[in-house]
């Protein structure tokens, strides 16, 4: 069956995920001494990071495709599934937009945390992103429990939330030399779930899509 344009655009979530993965994997090559097991991913895109140029090149499709994908999903899901699921997806979309705009406006001024104004704002953006991520994913999980039609969304949301919690708790528990390992669970959770939403959009039956 021929896919509509709005279905095909859902695959931009996968493109976003691959772009982000490429940046996380290859940007350290331009950062002498970077220890991925101990350092955060955000160190790679800090304002004075030697890897910033390569990071921007590799992640060029990440933010653009991510926000387009989640916006397309919001359009495609209108009037479909349950109101609870739609609410969760809308909240997740707000989080994605805050993340895309906020981290571009306020990158870390130095690798780590230097205490400058933009570092403080970076932390504020992070707090909003984390809060909205937890709330939106929880709502989607509940929607999946309540409706069999939303079950696959709920499963994906549960996996993403579990990854976030593993990352958050792990960063407090594991030795500092393994901080980067557990932190990556958190950073890949959101972009991974975005890709899952895009795949759901692509696979949605054409009769369910509003052109």
Labelled PLM ranges:
Residues 21, 95-102, 161-171:
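Aromatic-anchored segments of alpha-helical transmembrane domains
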């Amino acid at each position: 069956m021929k896919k509509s344009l709005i279905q095909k655009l859902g695959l931009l979530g996968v493109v976003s995920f691959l772009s982000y993965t490429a940046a996380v994997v290859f940007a350290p090559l331009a950062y002498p001494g970077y220890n991925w097991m101990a350092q955060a991913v955000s160190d790679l895109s800090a304002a004075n990071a030697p890897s910033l140029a390569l990071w921007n090149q590799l992640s060029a499709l990440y933010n653009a495709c991510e926000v387009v994908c989640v916006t397309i999903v919001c359009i495609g899901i209108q009037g479909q599934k349950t109101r609870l699921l739609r609410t969760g997806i809308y909240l997740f979309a707000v989080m994605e937009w805050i993340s895309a705009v906020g981290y571009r406006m306020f990158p870390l001024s130095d690798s780590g945390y230097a205490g400058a104004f933009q570092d403080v704002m970076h932390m504020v953006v992070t707090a909003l992103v984390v809060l909205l991520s937890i709330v939106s994913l929880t709502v989607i999980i509940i929607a999946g429990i309540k409706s069999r039609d939303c079950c696959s969304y709920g499963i994906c949301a549960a996996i993403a939330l579990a990854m976030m919690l593993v990352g958050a708790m792990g960063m407090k528990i594991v030795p500092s030399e393994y901080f980067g390992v557990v932190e990556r669970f958190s950073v890949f959770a959101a972009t991974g779930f975005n890709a899952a939403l895009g795949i759901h959009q692509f696979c949605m039956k054409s009769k369910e899509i509003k052109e």
